[in-house]
Every structure is written in structure tokens, then in C-alpha cells.
Amino acid sequence: MSNRSITLLQRVDNATEQLNSKFTDIVNSAKVSSKDKSALAMETYLVEESTSAMVRSLEDLLFVTRSLKEAWILGQIRPVVNKPEDGGEGQLADELLDKIEDTSDGVDKETA
């Protein structure tokens, strides 16, 4: 696997772990019990901090998907669809790429 793939997978793992732990923190702090105003204020702050961390994690996941889309569009990665070793025909990805290349060649000829 390439370094880029490993980095993207690590980012996904870190972001999902962060989302899970922060959501757990929010749920745990939402337990109903009689609390004074200072305890409620502290819990409110912790919930706001946890939601901010969740938003950052989601933005990181969006960055990963955007990077994958850009790499695919620029031809840096090939889609793996229906692998032969999995019992599939393995032709679908190649057919899709051929159609995309034919379409882009036709557009290039029309604009030239």
C-alpha cells in the first residue's frame, strides 16, 4: 500500500475514534441527576467542546473523501470494482474507464 493510502486510512481511523469517544462523552454527561449551577455550567462547556471536536473530525473525514475524489478524477487511482479474485468478472472497472476515456477524447476533439 502506498504512503498516501496509509495516511488516509489513519486519518479515517483517528476521526472515527474521535467521533465515537466524543459522542460517548456527550451521552455520559447527559445523565439526569440533580446538579448545582456550577456543575451544569461545566457540563455545558464539556458538551460544547465535545461537539466542536466532533465537527473537526467530520471535517477531516470530508477532507479524506475530497482527496479520494480528486485523485480518482485526475486518474491517480483506478476504481476497483468486481475483482476477479473475489469471483467477479473484473471487467466493470476497465469498461467504465474505457467509456470515460472515450468520452473525454470526444470532448477534446470537439473543443480543438
Curated annotation (Swiss-Prot):
Oligomer status and interactors: Component of the Mediator complex.
The primary gene name is: SRB6
| Similarity comment text for this entry | Belongs to the Mediator complex subunit 22 family.
Q: Signal peptide location in the record? A: none
Read off the lineage from the record: Eukaryota, Fungi, Dikarya, Ascomycota, Saccharomycotina
Location of the protein in the cell: Nucleus
**Protein name as catalogued:** Mediator of RNA polymerase II transcription subunit 22
Q: Can you list the GO cellular component terms from the UniProt entry?
A: mediator complex
Record's keyword terms, sorted: Activator, Nucleus, Transcription, Transcription regulation
Q: Does the keyword Transcription apply?
A: yes
- The UniProt annotation puts the region (Disordered) at 83-112
